[in-house]
């Protein structure tokens, strides 16, 4: 895992009312000061997360619960009606058996996407991984600061 340093800075975190989704609780925007920190230059991959699972026998939250939310376009159209969705966010479908190594449900696999970012990882799962990998999970503020790429816009590209 490679880390890159980010300098201290001030940025606007969150969105104005009417932007995004109220359920995300990201409004109103607030100015945040961030001290210098380091962040991984890529997200954790399926391969890296599998190494953690293999080494520890850890069971993820999605595996324990037995389901997780999948973006609707990753589910076969004829199966979409079978699954529950998030009120106000119909693009998320609650799929039984979806978890980190079965990203779109029990028939799916990560075999061909080992270098893709791991998905269906809860905060608890991420903290367990970071403890095992001896790295620090960025805070929400650090993550948003890094994701915005030093801009004041909603997205790094504008």
Language-model features: locations:
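Acidic helix-start/capping segments at beta-turn-to-alpha-helix junctions
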Residues: 58-81
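Acidic/histidine-rich helix-loop elements
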Residues: 12-25
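Short, flexible active-site-adjacent loop segments at beta-strand->alpha-helix junctions, enriched
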Residues: 10, 17, 43, 64-66, ...
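Short aromatic-cysteine micro-motif
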Residues: 22-57, 85-151
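Mature N-terminal segment immediately following signal peptide/propeptide cleavage
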Residues: 1-13
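An exposed tryptophan-centered "aromatic clamp" motif
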Residues: 150-158
């Amino acid at each position: 895992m490679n880390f890159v340093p980010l300098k201290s800075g001030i940025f606007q975190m969150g969105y104005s009312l009417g932007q995004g989704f109220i359920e995300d609780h990201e409004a109103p925007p607030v100015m945040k000061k961030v001290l210098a920190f380091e962040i991984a230059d890529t997200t954790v991959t399926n391969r890296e997360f599998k190494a953690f699972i293999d080494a520890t026998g850890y069971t993820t939250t999605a595996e324990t619960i037995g389901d997780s939310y999948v973006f609707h376009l990753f589910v076969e159209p004829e199966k979409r009606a079978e699954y529950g969705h998030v009120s106000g966010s119909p693009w998320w479908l609650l799929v039984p058996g979806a978890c980190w190594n079965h990203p779109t449900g029990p028939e799916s696999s990560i075999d061909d996407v080992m270098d893709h970012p791991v998905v269906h990882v809860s905060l608890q799962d991420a903290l367990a991984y970071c403890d095992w990998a001896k790295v620090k999970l960025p805070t929400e503020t650090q993550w948003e600061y890094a994701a915005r790429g030093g801009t004041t816009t909603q997205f790094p590209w504008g």
